Amino acid sequence: MRPDQIQPEMYEKQLQDKQAELAKLMATLSLPEMEVFASQPTHYRMRAEFRIWHDGDDLYYAMFDSADPRTPIRTDQFLAASRLINELMPKLLDAVRDVPVLRYKLFQVDFLTTTTGEALISLLYHKPIDAEWNAAVQQLNNAFPACHFIGRSRKKKQIITRDFVMETLTVNGQKFHYQQVENSFTQPNAGISEKMLEWALDVTKEASGDLLEMYCGNGNFSIPLARRFDRVVATEISKVSVNSAQLNIAINGMHNVQVVKMASEDVSAALNGDVELPKSLVQAGVSELTPSVVLVDPPRAGLDDATVELIRKIDSILYISCNPETLKANLEALSNTHEVVRYAMFDQFPYTHHVETGVFLRRKAS
């Protein structure tokens, strides 16, 4: 993304263009009216990554145009990023510029912030980081007491205080707390994330019984939805995300959610009866689980055939998609057994062609 792509005066038009593109792609499917959830036009991203460009005595943040990836675009401020990131950007450079051990071979800075004012700053180097660097970054941390710092160089990660922030999302007036770990997946647009959670709660308001969730991440959906169901069993392949999910379940006081570390393909094979149930699923009580709803939030590749066959067996499907093309293919595969009753577009990534889509399906009457 180029910084000049952020044009607040064009926000509504780009939103309408996205809506039209999504409607065109999905035109061959039988869908209800699209619900559209707009983002804030500026300061919506809670995380951002910048290259660091060294030009003589000068030092500045840089972004690049994919059409010209060799030419840096000086980025002193970034309207897409949170206000806290924009506040920290010049202060950090001023603090690093005259400290050789912090400046030398620094090539990237990553910011992760929260709605509650926390910040985690990762400094990435093309050199080893050593005791001298550690002493200097400790002094830097003293100058930024509300921030946490991480140093990264080849095969090394140095944590100063901690490598995560605690985010709070407000959903229908209720606050939910989430650990978000550096370099792990979280939705970048907190405002849209809150709207997605509210929508998920709304479409499942008549649900009962149990929930099966696949690709649960850090428990983003699992935790608010837990109050809708008797039991929730959620699966996730990333060890870091599983650990965060378990912590988040505890700090939010949820006692009916269990998270299992397992790839979706293995979950599908086990629950479809193709292989024996692994011990982790047995311990989670999957044999006694009676899901009325399954929630899937797959990567851009969408759902594999075995997972489609698994979720086909469940009466209601809540599908969160980051790729409308693979979503369309999966919906076509499910069309013989299920119909879409709710359909929403979430502008998680303004000024880009990317969208998040949510659909809620119910089994067709026999």
UniProtKB/Swiss-Prot annotation:
Disulfide bonds: none annotated. GO terms for molecular function: rRNA binding; tRNA (uracil(54)-C5)-methyltransferase activity, S-adenosyl methionine-dependent; tRNA binding. One of its GO terms (biological process) is tRNA methylation. It is an enzyme of class 2 (transferase). The active site is at C322, E356. InterPro entries: MeTrfase_TrmA_AS, MeTrfase_TrmA_CS, SAM-dependent_MTases_sf, TrmA_MeTrfase, U5_MeTrfase_fam. Signal peptide: none annotated. Keywords: Methyltransferase, S-adenosyl-L-methionine, Transferase, tRNA processing. Gene3D superfamilies: 2.40.50.1070, Vaccinia Virus protein VP39. Its EC number is 2.1.1.-, 2.1.1.35. Belongs to the class I-like SAM-binding methyltransferase superfamily. RNA M5U methyltransferase family. TrmA subfamily. Dual-specificity methyltransferase that catalyzes the formation of 5-methyluridine at position 54 (m5U54) in all tRNAs, and that of position 341 (m5U341) in tmRNA (transfer-mRNA). HAMAP family: RNA_methyltr_TrmA (MF_01011). This is tRNA/tmRNA (uracil-C(5))-methyltransferase. The gene is trmA.
